[in-house]
C-alpha cells in the first residue's frame, strides 16, 4: 500500500532511453519490454496523471561511430531523429493495444505517419487524458533527446521530468564498475555540476536548472518503480533547487 493515496504529480514528462526498449536484446525493440512499459504508463493514466513521453533512438541508430567514419553530423542526427519516430510508433501501438488513447507528435513533418508537434494541441490532449509521445527530438541537429525531454517538459508545464534508465538513481561513480559507488536520494542542480555527476548532457541539464524543472532519475526496468515514483515514495534520485 502506498503511503500517499494521491499521486505526487499531476503532469509528468517521461524520458525513456532507446536502449531501455531493447531489454536483453542487442538491438531493436523487445516486444515484452514495450508491452510492460505500456502497461506501466496505463497505470499512471488510470491514476489521473497526464503523461508526456520522449523516447531516445539509441536502440536503432547511433550516429557517433558513423560520424567518426566521416558521415556528416547533421545527416547522422537526422537519422537519429527518425529512429525516435520509429520507437514512438511502436510505443503508440503498444498503448493502443493496452486500450490507452495516445497521440504521436513529431518535431519534423511526417504527413500520414504522425502529427506535427503543436504546443497548444499537446496540452489540450494531455488535459483530455491522452498520452502524448513527442518524437524526432527538438527537430534540430546537435540536440540530444534529453534536451528534447527537458524542452517538452518545460513547454507542457510538467511538474517533473522522469528519466528512466538502467540504474536506480544517480551514483557517485558508475555502480556497474565500482561496487562502492554511493547512491544519492536527493541532489541540488549545483551539487550535480560540482561533483560532475553524469545525469544528462550539460545543455539539457542547464535548461532544466534555468527553468526550475525537477529531474527524477530511476530504473525503468524495475517493476513498479514508475508507480512508486509518481506516488512520491522513495525511489530513484530527485534533482531540484535547494
From Swiss-Prot:
Keyword terms, alphabetized: Allosteric enzyme, ATP-binding, Cytoplasm, Kinase, Nucleotide-binding, Pyrimidine biosynthesis, Transferase
Give the EC class as a word: transferase
Q: Its gene?
A: pyrH
Q: Where in the cell is it found?
A: Cytoplasm
**Protein activity control:** Allosterically activated by GTP. Inhibited by UTP.
Region feature (Involved in allosteric activation by GTP): 23-28
This chain belongs to the protein called Uridylate kinase
Question: A GO BP term, please?
Answer: UDP biosynthetic process
According to the record's subunit comment, the protein's assembly and interactions are: Homohexamer.
- What CDD domains does the annotation carry? AAK_UMPK-PyrH-Ec
**GO MF annotation list:** ATP binding; UMP kinase activity
Species source reads: Shewanella sp. (strain MR-4)
One GO CC term on file? cytosol
Return the similarity comment. Answer: Belongs to the UMP kinase family.
Q: What is its EC number?
A: 2.7.4.22
Looking at the keywords, is ATP-binding present? yes
Ligand binding (UMP):
57, 77, 138-145
Annotated catalysed reactions? UMP + ATP = UDP + ADP
Binding annotation for ATP = 15-18, 58, 62, 165, 171, 174
Pathway noted in the entry: Pyrimidine metabolism; CTP biosynthesis via de novo pathway; UDP from UMP (UMPK route): step 1/1
Query: Which is an annotated Pfam family here?
Result: AA_kinase
Give the protein's function.
Catalyzes the reversible phosphorylation of UMP to UDP.
Amino acid at each position: 500500500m502506498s503511503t500517499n493515496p494521491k499521486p505526487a504529480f499531476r503532469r509528468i514528462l517521461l524520458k525513456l532511453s532507446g536502449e531501455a526498449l531493447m531489454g536483453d536484446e542487442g538491438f531493436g525493440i523487445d516486444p515484452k519490454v514495450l508491452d510492460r512499459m505500456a502497461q506501466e504508463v496505463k497505470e499512471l493514466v488510470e491514476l489521473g496523471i497526464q503523461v508526456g513521453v520522449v523516447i531516445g533512438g539509441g536502440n536503432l541508430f547511433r550516429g557517433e561511430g558513423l560520424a567518426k567514419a566521416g558521415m556528416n553530423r547533421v545527416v547522422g542526427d537526422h537519422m537519429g531523429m527518425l529512429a525516435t519516430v520509429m520507437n514512438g510508433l511502436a510505443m503508440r501501438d503498444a498503448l493502443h493495444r493496452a486500450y490507452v488513447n495516445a497521440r504521436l507528435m513529431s518535431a519534423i513533418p511526417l504527413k500520414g505517419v504522425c502529427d506535427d508537434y503543436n504546443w497548444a494541441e499537446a496540452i489540450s490532449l494531455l488535459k483530455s487524458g491522452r498520452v502524448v509521445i513527442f518524437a524526432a527530438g527538438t527537430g534540430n541537429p546537435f540536440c540530444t533527446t534529453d534536451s528534447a525531454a527537458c524542452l517538452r517538459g518545460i513547454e507542457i508545464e510538467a511538474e517533473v521530468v522522469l528519466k528512466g534508465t538502467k540504474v536506480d538513481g544517480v551514483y557517485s561513480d558508475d555502480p556497474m564498475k565500482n561496487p562502492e559507488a554511493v547512491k544519492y536520494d536527493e541532489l541540488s542542480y549545483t551539487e550535480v555540476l560540482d561533483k560532475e555527476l553524469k545525469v544528462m548532457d550539460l545543455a539539457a541539464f542547464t535548461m532544466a536548472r534555468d527553468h526550475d524543472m525537477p529531474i527524477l532519475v530511476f530504473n525503468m526496468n524495475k517493476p513498479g518503480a514508475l508507480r512508486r515514483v509518481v506516488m512520491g515514495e522513495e525511489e530513484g534520485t530527485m534533482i531540484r533547487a535547494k
